[in-house]
A protein has these predicted regions:
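Short, low-complexity disordered leader/linker segments with a strong preference
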Residues: 1-36, 64, 445-456
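Immediate post-signal peptide segment of exported/extracytoplasmic ligand-binding proteins
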Residues: 25-39, 67-72, 176-186
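Beta-alpha junction/loop-to-helix N-cap segments that form part of ligand/metal-binding clefts
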Residues: 29-34, 46-56, 65-147, 157, ...
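Short, surface-exposed alpha-helical segments at coil->helix boundaries
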Residues: 48-56, 84, 197-213, 314, ...
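Sec-exported extracytoplasmic/periplasmic mature domains
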Residues: 56-67, 92-100, 116-124, 173-177, ...
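Extracytoplasmic ligand/sensor domains, especially the bilobed periplasmic-binding protein
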Residues: 100-227, 277-303
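Extracellular/periplasmic periplasmic-binding protein-like sensory domains
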Residues: 137, 141, 151-162, 268-341, ...
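Segments of small-molecule ligand-sensing domains
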Residues: 326-335, 346-430, 453-456
Length: 456
């Protein structure tokens, strides 16, 4: 009983995510039975909450424009408080009590796996589509091919770990040459100590993919002089940075995510003996200008994806960023995806002719394509693990070297003085024409030089 009360039902008018949207010119008001979209995630997470907020905006926009096939969308949140058990319970309640047809699960592989298994057990009685919002764990889509009939309703709106080899080869083999014209021979790597980084730490022999450390040393001549797995939150970084400074590393690569306390890392880095060693952040809250404010400007010189970009990557990029900024929603990569997901679902329902036939919905999920703010939203249909039912990015036949052009356009930027972003290009050769005139790798400036400029 206590658990039921605590977990409640989170129609929370979607939880105070009603964002006080301004009234808009309405089309004919949608009517009939609502199509329920649910989200299972941690409401207080700085990574997950923006996804919920932006999806609520998308739902309100669609309803204001007449709904989907004349029916309204209803958005419901189940707060898992960061716990796996509450994630399973939340998804169950969304299915049984809210009759959800589409359920999103926050992007932690461990949580997604548990929710997926429970959803598979309930699928016969409660047919639905489950979408994993941002996790990389290959297991999630490996099993879709292994047991298609059991897991055919599961999709991942991000790409699995093997899809990121082409990106790293491009960075290490191409763009870093321009950033470090005098040469780079030593680097340090910090790994977020969670399951999703293990395939890169250990390699994936079944896919003939080496560990990243082996790859960068063997293929690009850069010796990894320091490597450590660290807790995603609460790590005392100063001793680690002191050790890195003593290794002679010329670069720090932090394989971080939206759960990593990169703001704490940035503050400690700026005051450490390693402050002159450039830092690349793999992911996290550094993807928007909020990071400059969160760190009090101590992220000066750091590099990473920057997706609060007013660059016309597609026709939807600038309108999306301006809309999200208006609602004070940070535009990290997974937030772009979360918004795009709702409009993708709209097209899926229209293509399937409604929500009554889940097999038609699954077929539409597999075949529909839409344009969104960072490229194309579509799912891989080649039956190769773990790409099948994951968002398209690389060619599964050549994941180390070939990226599909235009499907995921990833701006790379460096924080310069005053919080200005200097773009350094993209994350693959196939998309570099998009960044012509915007920025290039040689526009990189060493952190020590940027600090000198601050003093002038």
């Amino acid at each position: 009983m206590i658990k039921r009360l605590r977990f409640g039902l989170f129609v929370v008018a979607v939880l105070s995510l009603t964002l006080c949207l301004p009234s808009t010119g309405m089309s004919a008001a949608p009517s009939g039975e609502p199509i329920v979209i649910g989200y299972v995630g941690m409401v207080l997470s700085p990574g997950t909450r923006p996804c919920m907020a932006i999806q609520k905006v998308a739902v309100d926009e669609i309803n204001a424009a007449g709904g989907v096939l004349g029916r309204p969308l209803k958005y419901v949140i189940a707060d898992n408080k960061g716990a796996t058990s509450l994630s399973v319970e939340g998804a169950r309640r969304l299915l049984m009590e809210e009759k959800a047809k589409f359920i999103f699960v926050e992007g932690r592989t461990e949580i997604c796996l548990a929710a997926q298994e429970n959803a598979a057990a309930m699928f016969k009685d409660y047919p639905h589509i489950m979408i994993f919002n941002g996790p990389m764990g290959r297991e999630l889509t490996d099993r879709v091919l292994d047991e298609y009939e059991k897991y055919k309703f599961c999709f991942r709106d991000w790409d699995p770990e093997p899809s990121h080899y082409a990106q790293q080869r491009y960075f290490w083999g191409e763009t870093w040459k321009d950033r470090f014209p005098k040469g780079l021979t030593k680097m340090a790597i910090l790994w977020e100590d969670l399951e999703w980084t293990k395939p890169w730490r250990d390699g994936m022999p079944d896919l003939n993919l080496p560990p990243w450390e082996e790859m960068v040393e063997k293929d690009y001549g850069v010796k990894v002089v320091y490597s450590k797995a660290v807790k995603p939150r609460g790590t005392m970084y100063l001793p680690i940075l002191q050790q890195i400074a003593g290794t002679g590393a010329q670069q720090i690569f932090y394989v971080s995510s939206w759960f990593t306390d990169t703001e704490s890392f940035a503050k400690q880095w700026a005051d450490s003996a390693a402050r002159d060693i450039p830092v690349d952040l793999y992911g996290g809250v550094s993807q928007t200008s909020d990071f400059w404010k969160l760190t009090g400007g101590k992220c000066l010189g750091m590099v990473g994806s920057f997706t609060e970009c007013r660059i016309p990557l597609t026709e939807k990029t600038i309108p999306f960023v301006e809309m999200a900024t208006k609602h004070q929603i940070p535009t990290q990569i997974h937030v772009h995806l979360a918004y795009a997901d709702v409009y993708f679902i709209k097209k899926v329902i229209e293509t399937a002719g409604g929500t009554d036939n889940v097999d038609k919905l699954i077929k539409a999920m597999e075949t529909v394509e839409t344009t969104y703010s960072l490229g194309k939203m579509a799912y891989e249909t080649k039956k190769i693990k773990p790409y099948f039912h994951s968002k398209v990015r690389v060619d599964p036949a050549d994941p180390q070297h070939t990226t599909y052009p235009g499907v995921f356009i990833q701006p790379i930027g460096q924080f310069h003085n005053g919080g200005k972003i200097q773009y350094l290009g993209g994350s693959c050769k196939e998309n570099e024409p998009i960044f012509k005139g915007v920025g290039k790798p040689s526009d990189f400036v060493m952190p020590a030089e940027l600090r000198k400029r601050d003093k002038k």
